[in-house]
Regions:
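Zinc-dependent deaminase
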Residues: 39, 43-67, 132-199
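A short, polar/charged loop-to-alpha-helix boundary motif
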Residues: 96-106
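Low-acidity, Ser/Thr- and Arg-rich intrinsically disordered low-complexity segments
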Residues: 5-27, 32-33
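Immediate flanking context of iron-sulfur cluster ligation sites
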Residues: 118-130
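Short beta-strand scaffold segments in enzyme catalytic cores
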Residues: 75-80
Length: 199
């Protein structure tokens, strides 16, 4: 049998019950502070962690480092869908594949299109560690990517904000939203060290 001493004493002593209620008016309605904190911790622990733009750029930087280890120019890219799911990630593979078009951006676009069985990726975002060259900028436009995030600018070989500025050409039929500068210092440092070691 369950013994409910507190309930019994309140029933037999109304005055005492009133005094207890005045001391802790919400004691029967709300959990203690410790229990509340515990419940909040449980809720937070079970909440899905949403990747950030920095998270995706850091993955692209990891791909750039892996490319450098293969003696490729350290450029990496990550392509994600509209819900933040990673569809593809890669670094430059021009040397490994003896393919001058195997830039990181081209690699992830090819992989994502193959994965989806589609030639266009209108809900997707591309994260890349260097401003895309004219070839890659054109591929980004053809793939109809929604957003482009790039880390470091490329005044010599870029095709977005430098050089031919592909997205501003009258023959360009799609221009993604542009977000430069995320991870710029890290990306620039990778490139600087890579080329200094080879001079």
């Amino acid at each position: 049998a369950v013994i409910q001493r507190s309930a019994s004493r309140r029933e037999h002593s109304p005055a005492r019950a009133r005094r207890l209620a005045m001391r802790s008016p919400s004691s029967d309605l709300a959990p203690s502070s410790g229990l509340t904190d515990f419940m909040l911790l449980l809720m937070v622990a079970n909440m899905p962690i949403q990747p950030t733009k920095s998270t995706f750029m850091n993955l692209a930087l990891d791909e750039a480092r892996a490319a450098a280890a293969r003696n490729e120019v350290p450029i990496g890219a990550v392509l994600v869908d509209g819900e933040g799911k990673i569809l593809a990630q890669a670094g430059n593979r021009t040397e490994a594949g003896s393919d001058p078009t195997a830039h990181a951006e081209i690699e992830v676009i090819r992989q994502a299109c193959a994965l989806r069985g589609e030639a266009r990726l209108p809900d997707c975002a591309l994260y890349v560690t260097l401003e895309p060259c004219p070839m890659c900028a054109t591929a980004i436009s053809f793939a109809r990517l929604a957003r482009l995030y790039y880390a470091a600018p490329d005044a010599k070989g870029g095709g977005v904000e430098h050089g031919p500025r592909i997205f501003h050409q009258p023959t360009c039929h799609h221009r993604p939203d542009l977000y430069p500068g995320i991870g710029e210092d890290q990306a620039a440092a990778l490139l600087r060290v890579f080329f200094q070691e080879r001079r």
